[in-house]
Swiss-Prot record:
Residues 43-55, 105-109, 178, 240-256, 308-313, 378 are periplasmic. It is a multi-pass membrane protein. Component of an export pathway for enterobactin. Overexpression reduces intracellular arabinose concentrations. It comes from the Bacteria. This is Enterobactin exporter EntS. It comes from Escherichia coli (strain K12). Belongs to the major facilitator superfamily. EntS (TC 2.A.1.38) family. GO terms for cellular component: plasma membrane. InterPro entries: Enterobactin_exp_EntS, MFS_dom, MFS_trans_sf, TM_effector. It is found in: Cell inner membrane. GO terms for biological process: DNA damage response; enterobactin transport; response to antibiotic. The chain crosses the membrane at residues 22-42, 56-76, 84-104, 110-130, 157-177, 179-199, 219-239, 257-277, 288-307, 314-336, 357-377, 379-399. Keywords: Cell inner membrane, Cell membrane, Membrane, Transmembrane, Transmembrane helix, Transport. Residues 1-21, 77-83, 131-156, 200-218, 278-287, 337-356, 400-416 are cytoplasmic.
């Protein structure tokens, strides 16, 4: 592939066997988690007929994920990362087996579903942090942009496929099949992950885990560059919560049930296009400025989304948001990995991923509050333009990020 091409270069999957193993394991894992994501709310709704109970399970799992990201960040900086990844995946699979056995009971236990949701949320996120911290060692820091784009495509593809498979399984075999196949898929991911090389953490003094986590917070707050990246990531995730307004906006546009699906597909489609056309991003001399501008553009797209007179134009705005947010997210990921010291990678990746989880929840809550006081159109526009104003202020304040320059990585013959 020509080094000037906009298209994503997939050569890492050929030249880096360890990354290829991670790619395969991640795809299987995403499909497995997707089967779980369909089954849990359906089972709870069937048992309780309560949307509140369904929401409670999501909240509990999200809380466990947040704690798991914090703990996983500390563990990834203290212990051999391959062992942490394998332990987390295996333990997570045990929880899926528990859900399967519970579903096979004549009267499944609701409490067991909640407790196993906590178990799986914690251990799943614990492994994610260790894997993120290990990625620079697996592909080299010069290939992080390419690895991030391939990973983004994996996530998007798996997120599209798994709900469809999960729905078919629910229609034919019930939730136990979803849980059983999710468990099988999780244990299958251990096979490629076993081929990974040893991933020891960098040498550093031993300290109390809480003190170690606080050191990560202090680094994040003290670094204008890394802290600014994390802040932008949180705001971008808040903007993506606009999906909670889709049903109300669909009524406003008088959309059919089939047409509503286009709203939900638009952002993932835009993000996939962003990942596929990210070939030149790694060669940007000023990635910080590009990150800021793409983030501002994504906020503008959300602000305009609700104002569109036709739903098809709203879909275009959402796809544009998906594309711009993908560009910003890839730059965030790459700069975070390259500008964070090796000894801090686990904790900073954990904090960065955690702000994605909390940013989405905060954004959904704020939009829900706005929706109670304003029309859906006004709520969507207010959120987008409000974030745009904050983004412009950050463009002025984050001077170090705005002026950051990097030397574009050298492209070898194998990459061309």
């Amino acid at each position: 592939m020509n080094k000037q091409s906009w298209l994503l270069n997939l050569s890492l999957l050929k030249t880096h066997p360890a990354f290829r193993a991670v790619f395969l394991a991640r795809f299987i894992s995403i499909v497995s988690l997707g089967l779980l994501g369909v089954a849990v709310p359906v089972q709870i709704q069937m048992m309780t007929h309560s949307t509140w109970q369904v929401g409670l399970s999501v909240t509990l799992t999200g809380g466990a994920m947040f704690v798991g990201l914090m703990v996983g960040g500390v563990l990834a900086d203290r212990y051999e990362r391959k062992k942490v990844i394998l332990l987390a995946r295996g333990t997570c699979g045990i929880g899926f087996i528990g859900l399967c056995l519970n579903a096979l009971l004549p009267e499944p236990s609701l409490l067991a579903i909640y407790l196993l949701g906590l178990w799986d949320g914690f251990f799943a996120s614990l492994g994610v942090t260790a894997l993120l911290a290990a990625t620079p060692a697996l592909v080299g820091r010069e290939n992080l942009m390419q690895a991030g784009a391939i990973t983004m495509l994996t996530v998007r593809l798996g997120s599209v496929i798994s709900p469809m498979i999960g729905g078919l399984l629910l229609a034919t075999g019930g939730v136990a099949w979803n849980y059983g196949l999710a468990a099988a898929g999780t244990f299958i991911t251990l096979l490629p992950l076993l081929s990974l090389p040893a991933l020891p953490p960098p040498p550093q003094p031993r300290e109390h885990p809480l003190k170690s986590l606080l050191a990560g917070f202090r680094f994040l707050l003290a670094s204008p560059l890394v802290g600014g990246i994390a802040l932008l990531g949180g705001l971008l995730t808040m903007a993506s919560a606009v999906r909670v307004l889709y049903p109300a906006l669909a009524d406003n546009w008088q959309m059919s049930a089939a047409q509503i699906g286009f709203l939900y597909a638009a952002i993932p489609l835009g993000a996939a296009i962003g990942a596929l056309t990210s070939g030149k991003l790694a060669h940007s001399a000023r990635p910080g400025l590009l990150m800021l501008l793409s983030t501002l553009g994504s906020f503008l797209a959300i602000g305009l989304f609700g104002l569109m007179p036709m739903w098809i134009l709203g879909v275009v705005c959402l796809a544009l948001f998906g594309w711009l947010s993908a560009v910003s997210s890839l730059l965030q990921y790459t700069m975070l990995q390259t500008q964070t010291p090796e000894a801090m990678l686990g904790r900073i990746n954990g904090l960065w991923t955690a702000q994605n989880v909390t940013g989405d929840a905060i954004g959904a809550a704020l939009l829900g509050g706005l929706g109670a006081m304003m029309t859906p159109v006004a709520s969507a526009s207010a959120s987008g333009f409000g974030l745009l104003i904050i983004g412009v202020l950050l463009l002025l304040v984050l001077v170090e990020l705005r002026h950051f320059r990097q030397t574009p990585p050298q492209v070898t013959a194998s990459d061309s």
